[in-house]
Amino acid sequence: MLLGQKSQRYKAEEGLQAQGEAPGLMDVQIPTAEEQKAASSSSTLIMGTLEEVTDSGSPSPPQSPEGASSSLTVTDSTLWSQSDEGSSSNEEEGPSTSPDPAHLESLFREALDEKVAELVRFLLRKYQIKEPVTKAEMLESVIKNYKNHFPDIFSKASECMQVIFGIDVKEVDPAGHSYILVTCLGLSYDGLLGDDQSTPKTGLLIIVLGMILMEGSRAPEEAIWEALSVMGLYDGREHSVYWKLRKLLTQEWVQENYLEYRQAPGSDPVRYEFLWGPRALAETSYVKVLEHVVRVNARVRISYPSLHEEALGEEKGV
């Protein structure tokens, strides 16, 4: 799991009880086995919608569906329920000169997954320039010949935005199908005003806030770095999206009052720990963050930074 095992969840509950928020924890909904199974397919799609970001921040142009296999890795055929019967019947028949239905289905799924990736990049660009977006715009600029599949494409792109970037896609005009993009959980921070303005950092901030809760509302520094390393984020290693991660955690988010970074009381040798800062406490709640963490754990069991890199990989081609 991204944020630890059951023992860590118990520690979080224990810590929250001490702070008077224990009743709220009981409201956190843990996904059922069926929901987790469906989420597994969703996480595979999220991984498939993303491509790498160059160190210079200059994304490459989009690929055609035929050439998308290098950036679109879809291993679960249930993602797009197309031609299942045709695939099985073809296997029963002998060699044929007609196109392989399974191969055609795979190409079709890859094309749809690429549309999800394109829509994520389109929505990120809209968020960066603070513009609303309409269904008509998405159909014309991104979906094009896949209009019949818009509901599925839009749903999966919205999930990527929420789970990975910490951005909610909210409908504000049902009649006109108009949407706005806002940061999740009431947080007012997105990180676009810092050194790296290419991508919102709200998603990672929420994850770190969740890690702190999992450690009982105060997290030893080494526990945070260990959890981040599981996600492919390492102390002392610069990253194309987060640049200097230590600076982000111990300086930027501390200056923004989302985190406290202090010497652990009574530690010898000296050790440091992270706590929620006053701005995090004012803007969101333990329960909201834990609910978000549960959704992330259910949906994204893969390398976290690769999601950001791949989603931004072809942003210039939007």
Curated annotation (Swiss-Prot):
Query: Which InterPro entries would you find in this protein's record?
Result: MAGE, MAGE_N, MAGE_WH1, MAGE_WH2, MHD_dom
Which portions of the sequence form the region Disordered? Answer: 1-103
GO biological process terms, semicolon-separated? negative regulation of transcription by RNA polymerase II
Disulfide cross-links: none
The tissues where this chain's protein is expressed are given as: Expressed in many tumors of several types, such as melanoma, head and neck squamous cell carcinoma, lung carcinoma and breast carcinoma, but not in normal tissues except for testis and placenta.
Which Gene3D superfamilies has this protein been placed in? MAGE homology domain, winged helix WH1 motif, MAGE homology domain, winged helix WH2 motif
MF terms (GO), sorted A to Z: histone deacetylase binding
- Please name the SMART domains in this protein's record: MAGE, MAGE_N
According to its record, what are the GO cellular component terms?
nucleus
> What function is annotated for this protein?
Not known, though may play a role in embryonal development and tumor transformation or aspects of tumor progression.
The record's listing under PANTHER family reads: MELANOMA-ASSOCIATED ANTIGEN 8, MELANOMA-ASSOCIATED ANTIGEN MAGE ANTIGEN
Protein's UniProt name: Melanoma-associated antigen 8
**Which gene is transcribed and translated to give this protein?**
MAGEA8
